[in-house]
């Protein structure tokens, strides 16, 4: 974080009567252990700890002021910036800081593929200048301001991921980040329990337009029926990408799955035709690559160099990471899951070169009333995916196993991580491949820890 006047950073939060003079701030923190002289400490109430309990100590250690939800005993009023919502306070601080710098910003949202697309955008752009990106899962109203604070005078580009659970969240994130280009990867059913329908999810994702300037490119998946039907704001310029539809602005043709990723021909009506290879499996990752390409080139960056950058992208965490373990290929995809990403992973795995295919699938969370139907649909997909055996874990995934078994697939339901690991150790042999996928909350990596440790 660059040094910035406190009066600028606190605009819209602190009343004019608070006198900060020429004081400058080089740190905004929510962690009392990080407090240093001249910083701003934002107190967050939590289940285990309440930041308000540390507000007085933060001032003792030199904080310029504290942002609190209510008056705190021992904290002078002249050092207290009152804001009933700590998340709102962070967003205002982040937006005020962002307004002082002028990098080109790509904003990425969508139901599936946000993080991979963010990584591909970063790979496409970083060769053109100093570039930052959202780290980890910092894609919400606490994490996005933290990303803004990492922008500096020498930052030329930023790739910012925007997540949501409810209407209005993407709008607030977009107004804070003020992207120059927006991406919506697709409209799925994640958080449908909160939003009610995919139409409402589409409206929520389109809130990214709130922070886009007049004439800004909005990169959209032309194969998504909800985006195709959506009414777009007049101030944005849609850029459509597609897997196979040559009428789209950018399309992928001759898509091939190879041992180490995907290859395809990219046709861009503006820039020409390119052969692209990406180190990621599945047609869905081709779509992610197209989105990243569209965003980078519509920023005015050289298309050939963008294509080379995308070819060097690196996946993060447990997202379709291929591990070669004692002759068995394990595709670790247990960071997150929803019906669309499950189907995409199974479609990819069906083409994976190996002797036998095994899948360990767990619950998909936050699906509300659609949960039973969605898990049963995954069971039908699994039965058509060329699997030798399906192992399931989790209460909802039982329905996946029941439906898959009814269609003739050999299935096994594990009630514990130990049972799942034992099944894999008993069944799998060198030359086989394993797909592991579930929502983050299912923690299927614990099965893999046992499996790797005890492989003969």
Regions found by a protein language model. Name each.
Residues 10-11, 89-217, 222, 226-235, ...:
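Phosphate-binding loop of NTP-binding sites
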Residues 46-49, 316, 334-407, 456:
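Active-site beta-alpha connecting loops in nucleotide-dependent enzymes
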Residues 68, 72-77, 183-330, 354-355, ...:
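Acidic, Mg2+-coordinating active-site environments of NTP-dependent enzymes
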Residues 1-92, 352-354, 380-381, 385-395, ...:
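N-terminal leader/targeting and accessory segments in enzymes
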């Amino acid at each position: 974080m660059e040094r910035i006047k406190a009066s600028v950073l606190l605009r819209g939060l602190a009343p004019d009567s608070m006198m900060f003079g020429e004081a400058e701030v080089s740190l905004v923190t929510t962690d009392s252990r990080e407090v240093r002289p001249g910083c701003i400490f934002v107190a967050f109430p939590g289940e285990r700890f309440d930041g308000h309990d540390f507000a007085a100590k933060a001032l003792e250690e030199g904080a310029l002021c504290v942002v609190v939800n209510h008056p705190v005993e021992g904290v002078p009023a002249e050092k207290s910036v009152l804001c009933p919502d700590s998340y709102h306070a962070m967003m205002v601080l982040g937006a005020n800081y962002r307004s002082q710098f002028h990098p080109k910003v790509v904003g990425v949202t969508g139901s599936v593929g946000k993080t991979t697309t963010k990584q591909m955008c970063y790979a496409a752009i970083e060769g053109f200048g100093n570039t930052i990106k959202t780290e980890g899962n910092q894609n919400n109203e606490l994490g996005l301001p933290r990303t803004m604070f990492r922008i500096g005078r020498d930052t030329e580009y930023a790739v910012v991921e925007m997540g949501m659970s409810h209407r209005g969240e993407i709008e607030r994130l977009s107004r804070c980040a003020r992207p120059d280009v927006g991406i919506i990867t697709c409209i799925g059913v994640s958080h449908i329990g909160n939003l009610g329908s995919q139409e409402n999810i589409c409206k929520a994702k389109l809130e990214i337009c709130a922070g886009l300037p007049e004439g800004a490119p909005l990169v959209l998946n032309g194969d998504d029926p909800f985006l195709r039907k959506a009414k777009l704001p007049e101030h944005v310029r849609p850029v459509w990408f597609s897997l196979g539809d040559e009428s789209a602005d950018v399309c992928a043709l001759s898509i091939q799955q190879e041992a180490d990723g995907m290859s395809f021909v990219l046709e861009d009506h503006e820039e020409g035709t390119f052969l692209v290879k990406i180190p990621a499996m599945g047609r869905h990752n081709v779509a992610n690559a197209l989105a990243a390409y569209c965003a980078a080139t519509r920023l005015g960056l050289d298309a050939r160099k963008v294509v080379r950058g995308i070819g060097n992208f690196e996946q993060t965490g447990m997202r379709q990471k291929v591990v070669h373990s004692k002759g068995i290929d394990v595709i670790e995809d247990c960071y997150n899951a929803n019906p669309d990403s499950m189907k995409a992973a199974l479609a990819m795995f069906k083409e994976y070169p190996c002797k036998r295919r095994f899948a360990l699938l767990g619950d998909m969370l936050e699906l509300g009333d659609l949960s039973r139907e969605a898990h049963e649909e995954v069971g039908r997909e699994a039965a058509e995916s060329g699997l030798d055996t399906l192992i399931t874990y989790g209460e909802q995934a039982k329905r996946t196993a029941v439906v898959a078994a009814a269609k003739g697939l050999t299935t096994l339901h594990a009630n514990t991580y130990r049972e799942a690991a034992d099944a894999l150790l008993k069944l799998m042999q060198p030359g086989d491949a394993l797909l592991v996928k579930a929502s983050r909350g299912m923690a299927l990596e614990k099965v893999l820890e046992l499996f790797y440790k005890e492989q003969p």
